[in-house]
Amino acid sequence: MIQIGKIFAGRYRIVKQIGRGGMADVYLAKDLILDGEEVAVKVLRTNYQTDPIAVARFQREARAMADLDHPHIVRITDIGEEDGQQYLAMEYVAGLDLKRYIKEHYPLSNEEAVRIMGQILLAMRLAHTRGIVHRDLKPQNILLTPDGTAKVTDFGIAVAFAETSLTQTNSMLGSVHYLSPEQARGSKATVQSDIYAMGIIFYEMLTGHIPYDGDSAVTIALQHFQNPLPSVIAENSSVPQALENVIIKATAKKLTNRYRSVSEMYVDLSSSLSYNRRNESKLIFDETSKADTKTLPKVSQSTLTSIPKVQAQTEHKSIKNPSQAVTEETYQPQAPKKHRFKMRYLILLASLVLVAASLIWILSRTPATIAIPDVAGQTVAEAKATLKKANFEIGEEKTEASEKVEEGRIIRTDPGAGTGRKEGTKINLVVSSGKQSFQISNYVGRKSSDVIAELKEKKVPDNLIKIEEEESNESEAGTVLKQSLPEGTTYDLSKATQIVLTVAKKATTIQLGNYIGRNSTEVISELKQKKVPENLIKIEEEESSESEPGTIMKQSPGAGTTYDVSKPTQIVLTVAKKVTSVAMPSYIGSSLEFTKNNLIQIVGIKEANIEVVEVTTAPAGSVEGMVVEQSPRAGEKVDLNKTRVKISIYKPKTTSATP
């Protein structure tokens, strides 16, 4: 274990331990090189550092994740070894794993479950494109950021399609609750194995639990390739059949029945909540024969309740005691056949006479009493026709919100279906006005007109949809930039909550930035992107020995100025250029050494352009070796590349002694 507060690998200050896996520990750390950015550091535990298989598996994860750059995959920032310890650093996701999220937020709405699964599929599409099978997909290996973004992690047992397994039992690595049937049989994991695991994860999101469980790994594994998948709709009636069909196909036991790619599953998932799939039949597979698929017809509630219970009881009794065809209780001696026929005929005739007499007596005294038909789920027109056919009158129509019954269809009658009423009784209809609530989607980046139409379709009144415009140079006019209610919010139509959409409009003004010190090419490009006409961007060059050539030294107008692009004015940028001429300093009275050094190092004159001559005459007070003349003179302009500088040094004549 790494000590808290220690600086690991020369850059990571360990804050705390946040995880402990089968082979590695995970720490929250601050990256000192990246200004204290929080990262997760995963370190292979000491007892595995000398295990070549463990090290290979750890390095496999590092390589696999480093090769996958995707917004829905945890990003690797560093891989290395410190004091013999294998480690990798990755982005820190400050949220929950999907397992815990399901536990704390179940039930998840259909929309949220589809959104999360869609993000997981996009991540795995990249992995599969790169030839990588995860092989350990489970909710614990999917992290959710505070804004609900899903990120896949822990590619610790991922394997490339073409690579050889690490060990003979390698194909059985992974969590058995999400293990595909082919893996449970010991076959090699494939892309379709990951798809199966995602199907089980999706099942868990919509039901709150895993489909197969048991006392041992063997028991659970057997269920994966022997037991049919329990019905999602049986546990969560809000799930439409099209959505359950996605899970059924993803978890098909035969590979030929399962999705062949995550792209195929993603396309099917994307339309699973659409209106045109609302009446989809349940998808089933024959997992034992060559037949690929069958379709079960939809069964209505009335069909279910009409199945004779006596038959079920009889069958149950015959199965329970099949050897006893006739019991002592059921046995009766039988009369001769001729007498039996005569007796039955007389009894039947008497019964018919009695029934006829009773009917005549009842009908002559009371109006007919009829059971009200069940019209739930029918349109208003269909329900009225059904009731009129049964000799009922139509009463009042009332509307009521319903999460299950489609708008415009009957929820129930008043009095209720099956109730006995006289002919001509007025039957009231309770009609669905649609869902009382819905999940707010992510509208950012979409056209505001499309979003408004969608909200109106969901019965949000016009006066509750507020549009606020905001100038934008980055987004197309009419695009939604912000929304007041975040994605995933449950919107209750009865509470009349306002929805504010901030929509981009073409910018007419911009704020000029501080361009001093920046490269002129970048600034010109930025101004052009903000619709400043190129002919109004004026560049003035000025020699500078202090600034890099091309660097902006002055600007007009200044930083912070509001600039109207609809009425553009000139912007002047003063840009540094390399110094080519300077004013000649005065070196009269200086030494030769000082003068040359200053000309070369400070002024920038090349040594080859400096000429030194000696003169024997000089002003009074001159000292030998002193500069007494210079050309050019002090203050004159000197071209650093062309001008030759002449320096005259005083050297007095030597006089010889008289003999």
From Swiss-Prot:
Question: Is Transmembrane among the key words of this record?
Answer: yes
Q: Which residues form the active site?
A: 136 (proton acceptor)
Q: How is it modified after translation?
A: Autophosphorylation occurs predominantly at the threonine residue and weakly at the serine residue. Dephosphorylated by PhpP.
Checking InterPro entries in the record gives: Kinase-like_dom_sf, PASTA_dom, Prot_kinase_dom, Protein_kinase_ATP_BS, Ser/Thr_kinase_AS
| Segments forming domain PASTA | 366-433, 434-505, 506-577, 578-651
Q: What family does the database annotate?
A: Belongs to the protein kinase superfamily. Ser/Thr protein kinase family.
The domain-related comment in the record is: Consists of an N-terminal kinase domain, a transmembrane domain, and a C-terminal domain containing four repeats of the PASTA signature sequence (Penicillin-binding protein and Ser/Thr protein kinase associated domain). The PASTA domain binds to peptidoglycan (PGN) subunits (shown in strain Rx / Cp1015), is essential for StkP activation and substrate phosphorylation, and is required for cellular targeting to midcell.
Name the UniProt record assigns to this protein: Serine/threonine-protein kinase StkP
Which organism's genome codes for this protein? Streptococcus pneumoniae (strain ATCC BAA-255 / R6)
Gene name, Swiss-Prot/TrEMBL? stkP
